[in-house]
Amino acid sequence: MVSSVSRRFLARAAVLTLVSASAWSVPASAAPPVTGPLAANPFLGPLGTATMHGDAGSSDVTPLAGPAAGAGVTVYPLGAACPTLLEGADGLVVGLCTAIAGQTPTVFLFDTAAPGPVGGALASLPLTKGSLLGGVYAFLDNEDRLVVVDGARRLLRVAHVRGDDGAWRLTATVQSDLSGVIPQGDNVTGLVPDWSGNVWFATGHGVVGFVGRDGGVGTVRLPSGESVANSISSAPNGGVAVASTHALYELRAKNSEPEILWRAAYDRGAARKPGQLSWGTGSTPTYFGPVRGDEYLAIVDNADDQVRLIVARSGSGEQVCSIPVPVGGSENSPIAIGSSIFVASTYGYPYPTVPEGAGPAVPANAPFHGGLSRVDLTADGCVPVWDSRVRSAAVPRLSLADGGIHTLRRVGPDSATPLDGFDYVVVDPETGAVRTSTHLPGTVAEDPLQMAALITRGGALWQGTVTGIVRIG
């Protein structure tokens, strides 16, 4: 949910009506530096900017540097929530947003160099409407085309071209009609290519499959009652990870059909937690590891008393560790690279709406205290490193270039009010301390709703909000 579902939500939330903290439990000395490999999928656009979570493995890590201190702010008032913002090799930003009026998914094209305090789109293209979370997740392929499944259950590739008149246009080509394998009323919530070029998808009602490069389609259905509310991930080893509302799966393509390699149930708790969008994990599963970048998978469960970070071995599903994290609950995909994992709390986050069928939250609401935790995977298992009180209001993004975790922080009382504001902050991954903080204009009309940010090659951070985009830098 991107995740997210992308997570990351929401277009999730667009759908709706408008309506300083420091680190604690910090070790005496800084933790080891965070580093590790990022696997570049040959069928995706640039590493770090082609998917909601940065790459096919959903690391939420980028090789690019974020904004410098004191960078200017540009607001894009689009009348739409923008959970998916991606940058292609041509340096243009493509957004997949959901219009507040009519809840129509819309593709936008933006110029990253546009000056001024208020920005706009170069072109837009409405898509067929589906569910609240259907179409939230998309990716840019290696030709800078947006790959998405629309509400009519068609796999589209949306290209942007500049005409002789200088105007930009968005054009959609149907790659595959999936209405024969995805039932009416069901929608795709996760989408990713594997290393062979198959485009994998997962639906809210538990259909998992892929469209092959030859156009063939293969599917498998998860057990009755299991749904998929977050996006999916792929790895160089051929694996594709899916987290349902009950279990973590790893699959692969075999003889033109998806094969389930293993299934590992997790503690989904007694009900949906406040600040989450489904009853179960809020994680898009994250591939990571110190050698290839795909040795392990990480998710956060939904246990009642205290949620746990779960790390499983890719390929076998063997549980490597399970450790409590003091975040209450998380709707965000973990950041993970090398041997380090970061988990952000969304427990109590005031989403204005939740997907149909999400079920009641227990309790119905709760204060949003926030929190960000680092856990390292060692020879002895998972070891807690630090916990921070940062009230992250977006999916945090770790930059390997500048060594900071970039996010937006909600400012106001823990109970959350319409007068709350937001800061752009950079957190030190070695200590959990806030390095820099910049106050942003606006209040809940610019709520990032736990959506993922994009860091561009030009060093700007683009953050989707409930009404459009805030660009820093």
Task: Mark where each language-model region is.
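Asp-box/WD-like beta-propeller blade repeats and closely related beta-sheet repeat scaffolds
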Residues: 122-134, 152-153, 159-196, 203-205, ...
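Sequence/structural signature of beta-propeller modules
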Residues: 2-127, 135-136, 142-145, 468, ...
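Repeated scaffold domains used in trafficking and secretory/extracellular systems
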Residues: 77-87, 126-142, 178-192, 225-236, ...
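Loop/turn-rich, solvent-exposed surfaces of beta-rich toroidal or solenoidal domains
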Residues: 97, 295-299, 332-443
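Conserved beta-propeller blade signature
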Residues: 93-96, 145-149, 198-202, 239-242, ...
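Structural motif
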Residues: 100-111, 152-163, 205-212, 246-252, ...
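Surface-exposed loop and turn segments in beta-propeller and other repeat-based domains
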Residues: 68, 121-130, 169-184, 260-278, ...
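Blade-level signature of beta-propeller repeat domains, shared across WD40, Kelch, NHL, RCC1
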Residues: 447-473
